Amino acid sequence: MTNIRKTHPLLKIVNHSLIDLPAPSNISTWWNFGSLLGLCLMIQILTGLFLAMHYTSDTATAFSSVTHICRDVNYGWLIRYLHANGASMFFICLYMHVGRGIYYGSYTYLETWNIGIILLFAVMATAFMGYVLPWGQMSFWGATVITNLLSAIPYIGTTLVEWIWGGFSVDKATLTRFFAFHFILPFIIAALVMIHLLFLHETGSNNPSGIPSDSDKIPFHPYYTIKDILGFLVLILLLMLLVLFSPDLLGDPDNYTPANPLNTPPHIKPEWYFLFAYAILRSIPNKLGGVLALVMSILILAVIPFLHMSKQRSMMFRPISQVLFWILVADLLTLTWIGGQPVEHPFIIIGQLASFLYFLLILVLMPVCSLIENKMLKW
């Protein structure tokens, strides 16, 4: 009799995705981040569900409902900080996952890559709206500043912003709709993840060498199930260390002050994982130009597959490209630092140079470097 996992319509899908999936024999820890993102999404949906049971999306009670969760609900503080810091872990894994894709040329799987970009935008939108919900000072002013950017769109801008706000400022209507969207989006993300995996399993995983590995495949279970579980344990350990020892390390103290439309905080800034994009936005003096640069800083990922000039897929055997890649990483860290600094000298010019270098590296230097490497190899 054939095993039920190979015949049952539902179990067959699970079997082909997690058990009998042929996987390259040489994929490194950089390939763990996909499953870690799945774990992060599950943690966020579960903790978010329990938070939603006690949260009220009303301007009068939102802040105090979060306080109530932390003070009065059984382990409410734990659920709240797991959710807040879980978002940080989510973005760490996301950026590592995208970085891995760029380094090893995984972007040549176009459908998988493009759905990944849509997923990135969806997760960023969800995180932004989630940050508004506690209705602290930074929640309110962050929402005001970021939604206001849409007013830079010619002709329809102002109307669009007022439509999103549900009034003439960020108020009760805005908070209610942000809560609704923040609740529904993770489930849309989960559906997109399924499509992401569907397209990935059409081609199979890439591997560090970038060479087709059809001749050397191993079953996903037990080799990569055990490897993923090790990753899960490390992620949970790091998350628990963060939550139990310094839960507010990555947060903003201003968000412990209830939202006040009459009092602007001295430095309005988003959560740390958006600072690089915020720095790019601020580096251009023109409003529309800044918004375009902000969108392009993420959307540029869609252009990367078409700028792949190398005869090799991966950067594993391309030392000059490797140097440029790590300069790009350093540049993004610089932008993250600048995004958290006030708008004054020397931070303005550093931010402008780092923003210029970011686009220059991706659009010009890396493709040109690939061509030079081809010449060096006489290809």
UniProtKB/Swiss-Prot annotation:
Residues at which heme b b562 binds: H83, H182
CDD domains on file: cytochrome_b_C, Cytochrome_b_N
Binding residue positions for heme b b566: H97, H196
GO biological process: mitochondrial electron transport, ubiquinol to cytochrome c
Membrane topology: Multi-pass membrane protein
Annotated disulfide bonds: none
GO CC, any one term: respiratory chain complex III
Other comments on record: Heme 1 (or BL or b562) is low-potential and absorbs at about 562 nm, and heme 2 (or BH or b566) is high-potential and absorbs at about 566 nm.
UniProt function note: Component of the ubiquinol-cytochrome c reductase complex (complex III or cytochrome b-c1 complex) that is part of the mitochondrial respiratory chain. The b-c1 complex mediates electron transfer from ubiquinol to cytochrome c. Contributes to the generation of a proton gradient across the mitochondrial membrane that is then used for ATP synthesis.
Subunit structure: The cytochrome bc1 complex contains 11 subunits: 3 respiratory subunits (MT-CYB, CYC1 and UQCRFS1), 2 core proteins (UQCRC1 and UQCRC2) and 6 low-molecular weight proteins (UQCRH/QCR6, UQCRB/QCR7, UQCRQ/QCR8, UQCR10/QCR9, UQCR11/QCR10 and a cleavage product of UQCRFS1). This cytochrome bc1 complex then forms a dimer.
The protein, known as: Cytochrome b
Gene behind this protein: MT-CYB
